[in-house]
Amino acid sequence: MALWQASYVAEAIKKEHPSYCVELRELTTKGDRILDAPLAKIGGKGLFTKELEQAMLDGAVDLAVHSLKDMPTEVPDGLVIGAITTRLDPGDAFVSAHYDAVEDLPIGARVGTSSLRRRAQLLAVRPDLTICDLRGNVNTRLAKLDAGEFDAIVLAAAGLKRLGFERRIRSILPRSVMLPAVGQGALAIECRAGDAAILSTIAFLRDAGMTTAAQAERAFLRRVEGGCQIPVGVYAEVDADGQISIDAMIASVDGQRICRSDAHGAGEQAEAIGTALAEELLDAGGREILKEIGITA
């Protein structure tokens, strides 16, 4: 997925700036290397970004392409998110060889996911399910499903579509059941803060509406002290009039307690709206839920 994303941005830059020479450099992150443990147990923020950010700070590369959902809410000094792209699909995809939707699964069915967010929301609607950890790239995860290790798996719809696996999607989980991760479906292009040439080069990739939505979503996550591996879901969108709406939840890992609410307002107040919604959910029980998994908010 990471190589596809980098190649996509490289090709877009070459098309927009035909005279530019764009070189791809593959770097492996901690999150890529450790595949035999659940992401939540590896711990720490920046599992999929730290090595790339160090390479930029060292001057080895000029920019890095990330899934926005994998980015910590705090960017290291000297770096900046120079562009956030149009969101492809924010949804979570239900993938199965035999079943069309979560409600069709038999009692006790095995569902694969590496996400505490997905685990919690699945168990909220189907507490009988057996949720199993699933790591590896998209091809590896699909192969494990096809080998019969799981009755179903849940993956980001955008990733499946980008890699040409849209036909494997049996259904998209509705947001009433499954709120996505922060920034899910969008790409973030990170670069050095003072590199005016690179910032100008990637400006055409910026999506104004998605950038505003991401400000609200990331402000929410920042306030709840969350990395990308906590049971928190949030989705924001901006309408044609510049008004933003945001829906968010904090859940217990077993899915039996969910604090959920929404908020609306002017897009110019995106960060304040996201932060205020986080405060509301923390006060409504989210703080106690997060404390149980070692997070003080």
Say what each PLM segment does.
Residues 1-42, 49, 124-297:
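Small-molecule-sensing regulatory modules
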Residues 46-59:
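Short, well-structured alpha-helical segments in soluble
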Residues 61-65, 151-152:
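Short, Asp-centered acidic motifs that coordinate Mg2+ and/or phosphate
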